[in-house]
């Protein structure tokens, strides 16, 4: 099976891009970030390229490259463009594909469209990345509830951070969702340490079945 997987998070800056890089390398998949907001200092696609070890042709070009590091709806407004759903159809490519969203599920793309609306349209399995720090239970369960209300399939939750197994277990029990594993904070962080962590912490079959 050649999976197409959406990676989203309970919040911004939780390690979603690092996870996406690790997953793309783990599955030898292509990577696509539909909307990049903020171009100074490098993009998420360039970071994934460095951390995944994938060849350049596996890093698909963004549909929207916006200059301002802000919510996509605002970054697009500043650039004088509007993000439309029809422009965000999933690329038809051979092989597996990892798609990374921006921020969380309720991030607006324009005045009447949220990222979760796009995910519902795609109807692809979602990996929800959640931090392990204090507050994650509420954020994770709200995100699971939002996905379920839209009928979006959930592949499972990938936790990122230090080991807080009680929080992870209660989220998965109450949310009735699969625990995919936990990606620890890595120092140093490079493609070798990231792939080693994925091989230790995750099972490939959980993403392909």
Curated annotation (Swiss-Prot):
Catalytic activity: (7R,8S)-7,8-diammoniononanoate + CO2 + ATP = (4R,5S)-dethiobiotin + ADP + phosphate + 3 H(+)
Pathway assigned in UniProt: Cofactor biosynthesis; biotin biosynthesis; biotin from 7,8-diaminononanoate: step 1/2
Subunit note: Homodimer.
UniProt organism field: Rhodopseudomonas palustris (strain BisB18)
Function: Catalyzes a mechanistically unusual reaction, the ATP-dependent insertion of CO2 between the N7 and N8 nitrogen atoms of 7,8-diaminopelargonic acid (DAPA, also called 7,8-diammoniononanoate) to form a ureido ring.
The enzyme's E.C. designation: 6.3.3.3
Active site per the UniProt annotation: 33
Gene name of the record: bioD
Residues passing through the membrane, by range: none
A GO biological process held by the record: biotin biosynthetic process
Binding residues for ATP: 13-18, 100-103, 184-186
Location in or out of the cell: Cytoplasm
Protein name: ATP-dependent dethiobiotin synthetase BioD
Family recorded in the similarity comment: Belongs to the dethiobiotin synthetase family.
Major localization listed first in the record, in broad terms: cytoplasm
Enzyme class at the top of the EC tree: ligase
Binding site for Mg(2+): 17, 47, 100
């Amino acid at each position: 099976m050649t999976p197409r997987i959406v990676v989203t998070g309970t919040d911004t800056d939780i390690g979603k891009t690092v996870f996406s890089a690790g997953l793309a390398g783990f599955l030898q998949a292509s990577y696509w970030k539909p909307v990049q907001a903020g171009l100074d200092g490098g993009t998420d696609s360039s970071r994934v390229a460095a951390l995944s070890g994938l060849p350049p042709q596996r890093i698909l070009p963004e549909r929207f490259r916006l200059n301002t590091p802000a919510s996509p709806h605002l970054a697009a407004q500043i650039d004088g463009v509007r993000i439309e759903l029809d422009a965000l159809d999933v690329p038809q490519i051979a092989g597996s594909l990892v798609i990374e969203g921006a921020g969380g599920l309720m991030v607006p793309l324009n005045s009447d469209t949220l990222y979760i609306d796009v995910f519902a349209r795609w109807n692809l399995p979602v990996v929800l990345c959640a931090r392990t720090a204090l507050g994650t239970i509420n954020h994770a369960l709200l995100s699971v509830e939002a996905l379920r209300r839209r009928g979006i399939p959930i592949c499972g939750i990938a936790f990122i951070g230090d080991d807080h197994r009680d929080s992870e277990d209660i989220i998965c029990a109450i949310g009735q969702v699969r625990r995919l594993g936990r990606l620890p904070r890595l120092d140093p962080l490079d493609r070798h340490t990231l792939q080693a962590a994925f091989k230790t912490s995750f099972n490939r079959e959980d993403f392909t079945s």
